[in-house]
């Protein structure tokens, strides 16, 4: 498949033109015209680039790419090394950020719901999903379920919160600042990737369960599901590489 055709296909699937983003979505760096082997990952870090080379890939698709707004435009140090690796090896670098967070089937938030058996009911905000569990569940049992599904223990703030959870809101990645909007919507628990210093106090004083799983952990499954879709629909050679990141 040609590189710009792949971009067009994914842009259409993720409805990329509908979203304003803080980073370019699509083919960020043009490489070899014909795509032979694709590596997917969360972030286009140097380790992922090196792994892609070892796999003989000439295309990389990530959730966190390059050229973010308000980022320095100077090409120094690690930025220089990363770009040199990509350009000197004729690699295509693709990135989809917000479109891959909120796609109703492939997106990170949809995948969280799938993993934790949450019925998606709608959106509180464009990036803030809400839904219900199959049945009311003890909050500590739900915490254990998260640990089992994500293979890591979540941070769980529960002071003053109800014992059982029915209505839950969630946002992949850096969503901790949505906790008040989630509370105002009348949910029992809020789940996201990151936690800030003030989040504990807000959750405690509002009497709401707060779960932090990690930015990386909540944003692996979207890029994985996109890769599986490309493999199944277009028979492309796609491999997901998980670069360990506890944050």
From Swiss-Prot:
InterPro entries: DUF34/NIF3 (IPR002678), DUF34/NIF3_sf (IPR036069)
Pfam families assigned to the protein according to its UniProt record, in alphabetical order: DUF34_NIF3
Superkingdom of the organism of origin: Bacteria
GO cellular component, one term: cytoplasm
Residues bound to a divalent metal cation 1: 63, 101, 219
Subunit field text: Homohexamer.
Family to which this protein belongs: Belongs to the GTP cyclohydrolase I type 2/NIF3 family.
Protein name, entry field: GTP cyclohydrolase 1 type 2 homolog
Biological source species: Buchnera aphidicola subsp. Schizaphis graminum (strain Sg)
């Amino acid at each position: 498949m040609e590189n710009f055709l792949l971009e067009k296909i994914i842009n259409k699937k993720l409805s990329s033109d509908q979203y304003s983003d803080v980073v370019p979505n699509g083919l960020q760096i043009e490489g070899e015209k014909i795509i032979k082997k694709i590596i997917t990952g969360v972030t286009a870090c140097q380790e992922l680039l090196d792994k892609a080379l070892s796999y003989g890939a000439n295309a990389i698709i990530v959730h966190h790419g390059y050229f973010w707004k308000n980022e320095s435009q100077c090409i120094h140090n690690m930025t220089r090394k990363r770009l040199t690796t990509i350009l000197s090896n004729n690699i295509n670098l693709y990135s989809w950020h917000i479109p891959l967070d909120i796609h109703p089937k492939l997106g990170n938030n949809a995948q969280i719901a799938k993993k934790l058996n949450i019925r998606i009911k709608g959106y509180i905000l464009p990036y803030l999903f809400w839904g219900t569990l199959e049945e009311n569940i003890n909050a500590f049992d739900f915490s254990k379920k998260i640990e089992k599904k994500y293979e890591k223990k979540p941070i769980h703030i529960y002071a003053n919160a109800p014992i059982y959870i029915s209505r839950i809101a969630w946002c992949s990645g850096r969503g901790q600042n949505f906790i008040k909007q989630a509370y105002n919507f009348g949910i029992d628990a809020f789940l996201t990737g990151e936690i800030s210093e003030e989040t504990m106090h807000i959750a405690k004083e509002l009497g709401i369960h707060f779960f932090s799983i990690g930015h990386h952990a909540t944003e692996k499954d979207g890029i994985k599901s996109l890769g599986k879709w490309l493999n199944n629909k277009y028979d492309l050679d796609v491999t997901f590489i998980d670069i360990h990141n506890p944050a």
